[in-house]
Amino acid sequence: MMKISYENKELIRHIQDICWRINQYTDYVAFYHFSGHVNGFDIRVCKSKEDYNNRIYAKELYMNLFEDDELYNELSEILETLQGYENGSKEVQVSETSI
């Protein structure tokens, strides 16, 4: 298994935290699933807690596929996107990517 830098671990913690905050403080619902056996995770943001099958953002990331600096950039982009949903500055649109 790949060793993850401290900076990237912190970004992962922030991503988990912001998913929790999205669920607590917005009308959206966020899902964060970690799969330790493949060192990957899946994040989804859905339109509302009642309409939790209507995805507006989805990202799947396998950390072993990236060098440390590339992983940092990917995690930073995810965090920035999630912050947009938390702050209400993201428009409701489907943005689905998979790596």
Annotate the PLM regions:
Residues 1-40, 49-99:
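Negatively charged, low-complexity tracts enriched in Asp/Glu with abundant Ser/Thr
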